């Protein structure tokens, strides 16, 4: 886990519990099989950005995901019931976060997707994306975050806002 604020965007890697206690906003990037290890109480009331993607090759098969009955971010929200989970940064390779951004209004500006059941988490994510040079595609509630997951057309490729809107709208629940 990493900690940081939207004021200075400073981040540092620390132990899970320490990060959770110190964070104003937390970023969760763990294999899904490790969700149960994420501390719950220290993250209560905080925005938690979920960058996770389901890879059954790494995570083992998770029936609810395989059947399209759950989303990765929904599983995290269920584990952190008093946190404000937002799907974020899952459809970009980490190296590109610092290289693919461009000023607002730039033609063909890259878009990143988000979804959350908490408007303040969605707003935070959109602001962060913009500060880093990306447009936002807000898919609404976490129940729609599957549209950004692996093997869907909104996942993993560089897309403009218009392209991502079209691709996520056309996505099938089961790949």
Question: What are these model-predicted stretches?
Answer:
Residues 107-175:
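Active-site-lining helix/loop region of Rossmann-like oxidoreductase modules
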Residues 1-25, 29-34, 41-42:
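Conserved N-terminal Rossmann-fold NAD(P) cofactor-binding segment
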Residues 13, 84-88, 137-141:
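General beta-strand structural signal in soluble alpha/beta enzymes
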Residues 47, 52-103:
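Rossmann-fold NAD(P)-binding glycine/threonine-rich loop
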Residues 21-24, 32-41, 54-70:
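Rossmann-like adenosine-cofactor binding region
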Residues 5-9, 66-67, 102-106, 154-157:
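Short, hinge-like loop/turn segments at secondary-structure boundaries
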Residues 31-34, 92, 118-120:
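Short beta->alpha connector loops
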Residues 29-30, 51, 88, 115:
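Short, well-ordered coil/turn residues at beta-beta hairpins
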């Amino acid at each position: 886990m990493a900690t940081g604020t939207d004021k200075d965007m400073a981040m540092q890697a620390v132990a899970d519990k320490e990060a959770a206690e110190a964070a104003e906003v937390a970023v969760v990037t763990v294999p899904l099989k490790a969700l149960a290890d994420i501390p719950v109480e220290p993250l209560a009331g905080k925005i938690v950005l979920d960058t996770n993607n389901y890879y059954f090759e790494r995570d083992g098969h998770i029936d609810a995901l395989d059947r399209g009955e759950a989303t990765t971010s929904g599983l995290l929200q269920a584990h952190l019931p008093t946190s404000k989970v937002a799907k974020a940064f899952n459809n970009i390779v980490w190296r590109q976060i610092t290289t693919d951004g461009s000023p607002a209004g730039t033609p063909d500006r890259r878009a990143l997707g988000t979804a959350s059941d908490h408007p303040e988490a969605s707003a935070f994510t959109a602001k962060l994306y913009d500060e880093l040079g990306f447009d936002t595609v807000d898919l609404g509630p976490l129940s729609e975050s599957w549209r950004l997951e692996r093997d869907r057309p909104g996942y993993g490729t560089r897309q403009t806002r218009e392209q991502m809107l079209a691709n996520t709208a056309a996505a099938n629940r089961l790949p």
